[in-house]
Design a protein with these regions (language model features):
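Acidic-and-aromatic substrate-binding clefts and catalytic sites of carbohydrate-active enzymes
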Residues: 65-69
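Alpha-helical cap/lid subdomain in secreted, periplasmic
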Residues: 44, 54, 70-210
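Positively charged n-region of N-terminal signal peptides that target proteins for export
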Residues: 1-3
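N-terminal signal peptide c-region/cleavage motif recognized by signal peptidases
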Residues: 12-14
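Serine-esterase "nucleophile elbow" of acetyl-processing enzymes
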Residues: 16-64, 74-83
């Protein structure tokens, strides 16, 4: 009887265990701005994970208008609340459009990455590009932020998250800044190889069970 009770307790605990979390931590490119959030790329990512047999749940903690400084300020709370196995980091576009110093952007992204890893989470970095409003020197320095961080911290990354979207008017909203609903599948395809590789790496290391 004691063995049976112990077994039932273990089975009950396993049944109540929450699936590992994939945390999307971004800005309006990921928040579902201007569309039904159920058709945003993070929502499509959840569908993709289910289709491919992953047990992970996707939590979208993206905020429209968010900067890297804002993200760095709230990452601790997000990590405590959701205990993610994987953080998909998509920030920096608002910083670049406002001409914030690339060094500051890099420091903020580094903080988010390092804090996520310190909590045991893997990280995927989604690279952003901006129009050359501030000249070629600033534009290059901004783009180098993602490349350099990926190399320095050995972070899986996507060089240009908005590839095949940013210059296609049919996939952009009227403001020519935000992707529309039709673009979400393209964004998912851009990010998916890095996300899948990160999930497989976490499974090998055993961290996906968190």
């Amino acid at each position: 009887m004691r063995y049976l009770l112990s077994l039932l307790t273990l089975l009950g605990a396993a049944a109540m265990a929450e699936p590992p979390t994939v945390l999307v931590f971004g800005d309006s490119l990921s928040s579902g701005y201007g569309m039904d959030v159920d058709r945003s790329w993070p929502a499509l990512l959840q569908e993709r994970l289910v289709e491919q047999g992953y047990e992970h749940r996707v939590v979208n903690a993206s905020i429209t208008g968010e900067t890297t400084e804002g993200g760095a300020a709230r990452i601790d709370d997000a990590l405590s609340r959701f205990a993610p196995a994987l953080v998909i980091l998509e920030l920096g576009g608002n910083d670049g459009l406002r001409g914030f110093p690339p060094a500051r952007i890099k420091d903020n992204l580094r903080t988010i990455i390092e804090k996520s890893r310190a909590r045991g989470a893997g990280v995927v970095l989604l690279g952003i590009r901006i129009p050359p409003n501030y000249g070629p020197r600033y534009t290059r320095a901004f783009e180098d932020v993602y490349r350099e961080l990926a190399a320095e911290l050995d972070v899986p990354w996507v060089e240009f998250f908005m590839q095949d979207v940013a210059l296609d008017e049919a996939l952009m909203q009227d403001d020519r800044i935000h992707p529309n609903e039709q673009a979400q599948e393209v964004l998912l395809e851009n990010a998916w190889p890095a996300i899948k590789a990160a999930l497989e790496s976490l499974q090998v290391s055993g961290r996906s069970a968190q």
